[in-house]
């Protein structure tokens, strides 16, 4: 909701000399509505998990063998993990829809999830930085333990679809990986809750923001970080390298 307000007043901010590092109204609306985003991605040939909105449409696909249980359901316009469930049977799925607690979408269940923080330059509209990490543990909708990795296939995938949107500044993306290909699940047009992992690994979006504020176009430096850097979130945050963690363990 806050992003919609900012995006709707994009030009007003610019008129008073404020740099609105937020998406356009159209892009913000797509990111907020997960089913609209799914349709948009499919129409443009972008890999994304098979998704249904209507229960009858899911049933038709299920009985044709196009999708299997388990599936994953979540609110069409939800955030975090509120209302999100793994569902193993048709009866359970029907019960969730009958309760009508949320306007659900049904998504094929995929494993191999990871995410990426990216920065889109305000002036060039190019992706100038990407930091990718695999999730080790997730709590309350956000990753609490992650490890950094690099994969040129993921970097290329992100760059292949970014022209379809109008972003500026930091974004957070969720992906799945299956059979050698990445699938885009969601885009949050804001700092991700686990951005501190990227920052701790040396990916400083704040420098990029300051450059844009000063009218400077940022250079593209994608994947400019170390692999094997862990973020371990407890009551506090620990950022370390995998090799150092193993060394401490063996010592």
Model-found features: residue ranges?
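Conserved N-proximal alpha/beta basic substrate-recognition cap immediately N-terminal to
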Residues: 1-50
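ATP-grasp fold ATP-binding core
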Residues: 41, 65-82, 102-112, 130-134
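Short acidic-hydrophobic, aromatic-tinged amphipathic segments that line or gate anion-handling sites
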Residues: 51-56, 85-88
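Conserved protein kinase catalytic/activation segment
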Residues: 181-183
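Short amphipathic alpha-helix with an adjacent loop that forms part of the alpha/beta core around
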Residues: 60-66, 95
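A short linear hydrophobic-aromatic micro-motif
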Residues: 50, 70-72, 103-106, 170-172, ...
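ATP-dependent carboxylate/phosphate-activation module, predominantly the ATP-grasp catalytic core
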Residues: 91, 97-98, 106-170, 177, ...
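Non-catalytic, C-terminal membrane-associated alpha-helical segments of glycosyltransferases
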Residues: 24, 235-251
């Amino acid at each position: 909701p806050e992003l919609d307000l900012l995006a709707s007043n994009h030009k007003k901010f610019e008129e008073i000399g404020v740099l609105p590092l937020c998406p356009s109204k159209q892009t913000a609306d797509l990111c907020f509505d997960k089913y609209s985003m799914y349709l948009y991605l499919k129409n443009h040939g972008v890999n994304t998990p098979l998704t249904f909105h209507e229960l009858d449409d899911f049933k038709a696909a299920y009985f044709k063998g196009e999708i299997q249980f388990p599936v994953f359901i979540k609110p069409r316009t939800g955030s975090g993990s509120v209302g999100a469930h793994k569902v193993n049977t048709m009866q359970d799925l029907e019960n969730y829809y009958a309760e009508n607690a949320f306007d659900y979408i049904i998504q094929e269940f995929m494993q191999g999830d990871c995410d990426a923080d990216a920065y889109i330059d305000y002036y060039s509209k190019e992706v100038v930085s990407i930091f990718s990490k695999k999730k080790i543990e997730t709590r309350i909708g956000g990753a609490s333990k992650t490890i950094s990795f690099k994969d040129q296939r993921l970097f290329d995938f992100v760059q292949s679809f970014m022209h379809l949107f109008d972003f500026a500044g930091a974004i957070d993306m969720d992906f799945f990986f299956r059979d050698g290909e990445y699938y885009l699940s969601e885009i949050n047009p804001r700092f991700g809750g686990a951005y501190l992992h990227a920052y701790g690994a040396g990916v400083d979006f704040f420098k990029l923001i300051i450059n844009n504020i000063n009218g400077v176009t940022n250079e593209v430096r994608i994947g400019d970080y170390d692999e094997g850097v862990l973020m371990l979130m407890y009551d506090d945050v620990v950022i370390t390298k995998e090799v150092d963690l193993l060394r401490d363990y063996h010592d």
